[in-house]
């Protein structure tokens, strides 16, 4: 009986550990506070990658997320060169953001995305000055990363 209990506990622990690694192993280091994003960028002397997304309704946003943002190539490159912030504008009730985050994202949209383009990818310097911008391109993650780097010039 004790042996069965040990096996059950071990199986549950293994499932939990696997799910934990899958969840956090694939997660991005996306910031949720833009002021902290700017502070980190200044401290680390990095540019800011600001992404306007409609994560649950914008098909090109979802495709960009799956092809580029979730790729290992992007994760590695972002860690080296950028502090990343996603200003998300979900529509489904289940995906709604906190009122504070919604307000913050709205302020960012007023400043950087007045036309309401989705997705909109903006490269900023550490002070928040726009260096360049782009949108969805149906290209590979490495090609999109090069596109972002081209905005640095």
What residue ranges belong to the model's regions?
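Bacterial Sec-dependent N-terminal signal peptides
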Residues: 1-29
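Thiol-based oxidoreductase modules, predominantly thioredoxin-like and allied folds used
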Residues: 30-31, 74-103
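A short beta-strand-turn-helix
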Residues: 31-48, 78
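Short active-site neighborhood of thiol/selenol oxidoreductases, capturing the structured segment around
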Residues: 44-58
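Hydrophobic beta-strand anchors of alpha/beta hydrolase catalytic cores
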Residues: 49-50, 84, 121
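The canonical Cys-X-X-Cys-His
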Residues: 58-61, 121
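Typically the conserved alpha-helix immediately C-terminal to a functionally engaged Cys/Sec
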Residues: 61-77
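Non-catalytic, surface beta->alpha helical segment in thiol-disulfide oxidoreductase systems
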Residues: 110-111, 115-153
């Amino acid at each position: 009986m004790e042996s069965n209990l040990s096996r059950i506990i071990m199986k549950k622990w293994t499932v939990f550990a696997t799910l934990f690694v899958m969840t956090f192993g694939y997660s991005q280091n996306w910031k949720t506070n833009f002021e902290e994003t700017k502070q980190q960028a200044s401290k680390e002397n990095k540019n800011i990658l600001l992404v306007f997304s409609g994560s649950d309704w914008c098909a090109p946003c979802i495709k960009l997320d799956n092809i580029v943002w979730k790729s290992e190539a992007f994760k590695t490159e972002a860690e080296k060169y950028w502090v990343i912030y996603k200003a998300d504008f979900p529509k489904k009730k289940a995906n709604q953001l906190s009122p504070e985050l919604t307000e913050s994202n709205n302020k960012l949209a007023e400043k950087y995305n007045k036309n309401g383009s989705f997705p909109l990818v903006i490269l900023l310097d550490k002070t928040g000055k726009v260096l360049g911008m782009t949108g969805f391109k149906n290209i590979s993650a490495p090609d999109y990363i090069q596109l972002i780097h081209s905005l640095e010039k």
